[in-house]
Structure formats: structure tokens, C-alpha cells
């Protein structure tokens, strides 16, 4: 059951403000509470329940050691998503979505490795043997790669899930995830089709306060999942230690 404090917090963050009624998607009807001054108002009790449902699944994914890729390229969401994803130690895309990011992941990984090889060149001195023009070209390439792919440099395999802010803006990312059966979690406003995603969080996806509130709640669940994983590993290590010591101990003669 969604608790009242959470609903009050959602209300204060303006999560309930949808789009103008003429822009609505009829599939969002179950999540709409009412119409006010030509604007659809989202039912925050349903939003709170959907956050809890999404958080439970996100926590499990994080606890299993898999990655959740956060995606938000719109201006008012970029910095918020980057900060929250970083805090949760998860990859994110806040610049233009690189076409084939998921469906052609091998090529994307090659581009990420190119960054590493440039860094290696700078460390071992190879970079200094290049001409001034070549060094400039390499630096430009490194900066471009960092801007577009730096935030996914640690993602060595496909993510277990996507978390998206604004499914209309990120429709290419969602299509790629669908092709690969990667579950999509998303903030879905009243002008969007919730059938496009697996875990719908009905919410205002335009106001920064609303985006910040939802991202704070979901990344807290992710961090809890990571914490559970860490605690589990510590317990396993503690259980294995006595057995390892017993095996290593020399046999004593009677």
C-alpha cells in the first residue's frame, strides 16, 4: 500500500501535472485522476504504487550484480539523471543516444576500447611521437568519445534493464531494448503510450523537480540492492574462510 507521506512528497514535487488534455494518450486513462483547467492530473496513489513495484524489481537487478542503464537526453533531465546514476554506480546516456547502442553493442564496445587505447598511448609515451596535427586529431576523438560514451565505459555487457525519462524522446532506445527483450522502466507522462514499457511510473516527465523526486526514489532502491549484494558477499566470504583455513592446516599425527 502506498504510504501517505510518499504521496505528499510526490504532490509537492509536482509529479501529478500531466499534459494538456488535447495531447493525451487514451491508454494513460487508468492513471489519470481528473482534468483541471485543460490539464490532466495524474493519480499519485497509482504513481506511488507503481514506484514501489518498479523499485522492488530494480533492487533485485542491482542485488544480482547486473547493470541498469539510465537514459535521459532532454535538457531538464540530463544533469539530474547523470548525478543520480553516478551515485548508484550505474551507467547512463544523457547525450544523443548512439544508434545501435544495444542492438550493435559490439561496435559500441570497440569505441569504448578506443578510448582506453588512447589513454594507454598517453601513458606509455606513444602519443608524444605523433605529429602535432595527429595529436590534435587524437585528442578531439578522445573528447568526442568521452562525451558520448564515457558514462558507459564500465558497462562490459548489455544492461539487464533500461530506466527512461520521457518515452517519446527516447523512442529509439526503447525500440532497441524491445528487440533484445530488455525490460524498460520509465517515467510516463499523459501524452505517452504506457504499453511501450514494462514498468510504468505515471509522472510529470517535464519538470525538473518531478524528475528529481522519481529518480531519487528509484536510485535509492538500486543502492539498497547493491548494499544487499555487498552484505551477501561478506557473509559468503566469512563462511568460506574457516573451511579454507582447515584445508590449508597441516595434518597432525596422533
Curated annotation (Swiss-Prot):
Signal peptide: none annotated. Residues 240-254 have a biased composition (Low complexity). One of its GO terms (biological process) is translation. Gene3D superfamilies: Glucose-6-phosphate isomerase like protein, domain 1, Helix hairpin bin. Pfam families: Ribosomal_S2 (PF00318). Residues 228-254 are annotated as: Disordered. It comes from the Bacteria. The keyword Cytoplasm does not apply. GO terms for cellular component: cytosolic small ribosomal subunit. PROSITE patterns: RIBOSOMAL_S2_1, RIBOSOMAL_S2_2. Keywords: Ribonucleoprotein, Ribosomal protein. Coiled coil: none annotated. HAMAP family: Ribosomal_uS2_B. This is Small ribosomal subunit protein uS2. It comes from Flavobacterium johnsoniae (strain ATCC 17061 / DSM 2064 / JCM 8514 / BCRC 14874 / CCUG 350202 / NBRC 14942 / NCIMB 11054 / UW101) (Cytophaga johnsonae). The gene is rpsB.
